[in-house]
Amino acid sequence: SSAASDVYKRQARKRAFKPVTVLIDGPSGAGKTWTSAALAERTNWRVVHLDEFYPGWHGLDKGSDMVAEQVLRTMNPGYWRWDWEADSPGDWASLDVRDDLIVEGVGSVTPANIAAAKERGTVVSVLIDGPRDQRRERAIAREPDYEQWFETWEAQEKDYFATKAAEADLVWEWS
């Protein structure tokens, strides 16, 4: 019907200027990457992994800041990838300000990141968590080299969740 078609066109035009940002936070091994991949498969939205730009194994706090400062900014959004082999900045990854985004990684749900996402359009924040031992096992199974860094990273996660993280819209805790 013509009326339904007109409503669809109006909504599509409106959406073209208001992208959706989904911020998915949680500690290592909680299921953020799996969840973001499942959501992207259903929506075709671009996924940005904080793992791509944390500046090294001591860079959780800086990586968290980069979400608002670079990834979600309304002019020239993107980020400098981190070259984990060279332990130095890599190439620039450009983003389209109009794209719906799924931003996943520990450090993604902060007051600054939520505010930056709201500047772009609609934002939904998610926290995923589970038992530490199971998370550790999952994280190391995915990336065996991570075992030597798990406790270093976990200390940064604890500090982040105690001091910087914002309350998420949705909390998914598995056991």
Model-based region annotation:
Residues T35:
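Hydrophobic positions on the alpha1 helix immediately C-terminal to the Walker A/P-loop
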Residues I24:
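Hydrophobic anchor at the beta1->P-loop junction of P-loop NTPases
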Residues K32:
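Conserved lysine of the Walker
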Residues E143-S175:
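Small-molecule kinase domains that catalyze NTP-dependent phosphoryl transfer to phosphate-bearing small molecules
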Residues Y54-V103:
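Conserved nucleotide-sensing/catalytic segment adjacent to the nucleotide-binding pocket
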Residues W92, R98-R142:
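ATP-dependent NMP and nucleoside kinases share a basic, alpha-helical "lid"
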Residues S1-Y8:
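Short, small-residue-biased leader/transition segments that mark boundaries at the very start
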Residues P27:
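P-loop (Walker A) phosphate-binding loop of NTP-binding proteins
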